[in-house]
Amino acid sequence: MKINHIDLGKHPILLAPMEDVTDPAFRLMCKKFGADMVYTEFVSSDALIRAVSKTAQKLNISDEERPVAIQIYGKDTETMVEAAKIVEQAQPDILDINFGCPVKRVAGKGAGAGMLQNIPRMLEITRAVVDAVKIPVTVKTRLGWDANNKIIVELAEQLQDCGIAALTIHGRTRAQMYTGEADWTLIGEVKNNPRMHIPIIGNGDVTTPQRCKECFDRYGVDAVMIGRASFGRPWIFKEMKHYLETGEELPPLSFEWCMEVLRQEVIDSVNLLMIWKMYFQRSAMVILKLIQEW
């Protein structure tokens, strides 16, 4: 699978952008376990152009993470364009636009999944951002606003026509938030639409190696994106890669092996602290989650 010139190989598995989760230390950890591409936490376009320090620091990426995508969100076209140009200066491999975040403080203000109620503005922003930068632009969104407005099949064509390089679809509506089950049937419909030629990345409820393989085989997606299933279990990428390659599950992980992961995470966090002090607390949260999972 390729996103423009970026070759992610066969059956790539990507780390989803997650607020308060995908900080530099966690991204590097997932990369070491086989994530083919990682995404930063989403970045507010409004805060970015106001030079809010905590927001600007989210643009810190390293070569060890590549390929890496920076994701932005917002509801104003000019602001999104200006933010996109700032992001491009950070030299990510990809710029991703968030049209899928369902939380009230984002969608309730018209950004993220809130854009699913304003498709003309969504397309205007997408077109403007694509035209404003030279790096590939991708989009992440949902099936639609609610069960009566699952518009993703038509919307995917419209977004493709705006010039995006790939599309990630979370298999829920905004109304579902993170409840119920992700509907991969519509993701498969988008992928099998003969008009679509850009890569389609599926996301939602991929929590086991077996489910990952099913998503590739049954729905034909070009890549699978792992979100909440990776939190406290960054080795899920290794498990899924092994299963895709061999058809077999990895042996159960030993406590000693998990402790070594924890030790390395502490080392990485301390090293990154010298550069990105603001991320230490978040890295500690990841460590705590790892311990709780055991």
Regions found by a protein language model. Give the residues of each.
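Glycine-rich, positively charged N-terminal anion/phosphate-binding segment
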Residues: M1-N4, G9, M18-D93
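Alpha/beta catalytic cores of nucleotide-metabolism and tRNA/nucleoside-modifying enzymes
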Residues: M1-N4, G9-I13, E19, P24-A25, ...
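Residue-level signal for pocket-adjacent positions within structured domains
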Residues: I3, I13-A16, V38, V43-S44, ...
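Hydrophobic faces of well-ordered beta-strands that scaffold small-molecule active sites
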Residues: I13-A16, V38-T40, V68-I72, L95, ...
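Active-site beta-loop-alpha junctions enriched in small/polar residues
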Residues: M18-D20, V43-S45, Y73-K75, G100-P102, ...
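Alpha/beta enzyme core
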Residues: K32, E78-A111, I119-I200, E214
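Short glycine-rich, flexible loops that bind phosphorylated cofactors or substrates
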Residues: A47, K104, R233
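Aromatic- and acidic-residue-enriched carbohydrate-binding clefts of CAZyme catalytic domains
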Residues: L116
